[in-house]
A protein has these predicted regions:
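Gly/Ser/Thr-rich active-site loops/lids in small-molecule metabolic enzymes
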Residues: 11-12, 42-58
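Long, hydrophobic N-terminal alpha-helical segment
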Residues: 1-44
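Fold-independent oxyanion-binding glycine-rich loops
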Residues: 5, 29-31, 36-38, 45-46, ...
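Aromatic-anchored, charged helix-turn/loop surface patch used as a conserved interaction hotspot
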Residues: 53, 57-82, 89-93
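Solvent-exposed alpha-helices and their adjacent loops that cap or buttress functional pockets
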Residues: 9, 18-20, 34-35, 66, ...
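Structural motif
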Residues: 3, 24-27, 41-43, 64-73, ...
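Glycine-rich, aromatic-bearing surface loops/beta-hairpins
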Residues: 80-141
């Protein structure tokens, strides 16, 4: 155990977050997300939800302030309602990075973007459309 590090973050994920550089992306996937197909590196967090993992990760990971939207969600398919979890995701992003914009990518472009991500965190989240891409920023003055 380490001080100040959420016990939700397994050692493998902590290493990945440290290895990521400016502009690298990490995907938080829900239980339906094809993580093994998309990710070069997959960290399984099956018993945890996307929002709690997002909260733990954003406590450590700076978001990229040099892009318009360093956070992206998978857009709903036509006719599907807006998922209630989006409000929780937005509130969590706002808590850690006030004013951060969130982009919405259609499903197949989202999958394409996910394939080039540094890593994928597979959660046990059962809410639909609960997938989040985070672009890492920088620390410094």
């Amino acid at each position: 155990m380490l001080k100040g590090i959420s016990p939700l973050i397994p050692p493998e994920l902590l290493k990945i977050l440290a290895e990521m550089g400016h502009g690298d992306e990490i995907v938080l996937g829900d239980a339906n997300f094809p993580a093994a197909t998309m990710g070069k590196r997959v960290v399984r967090c099956d018993g945890l939800g996307v929002v709690e993992m997002l909260d733990a990760i954003l406590a450590l990971l700076p978001l990229d302030t040099y892009v318009d939207a360093p956070v992206a969600l998978m857009a709903t398919t036509a006719g599907d309602p807006e998922p209630p979890i989006w409000k929780e995701i937005a509130a969590t992003v706002e808590k850690h990075a006030p004013g951060t914009q969130i982009a919405f990518n259609e499903r197949f472009p989202y999958y394409d973007r996910s394939r080039s991500a540094f890593a994928v965190v597979q959660t046990g989240e059962t809410a639909l459309y609960a997938n989040v891409i985070l672009k890492k920023g920088v620390i410094g003055k």
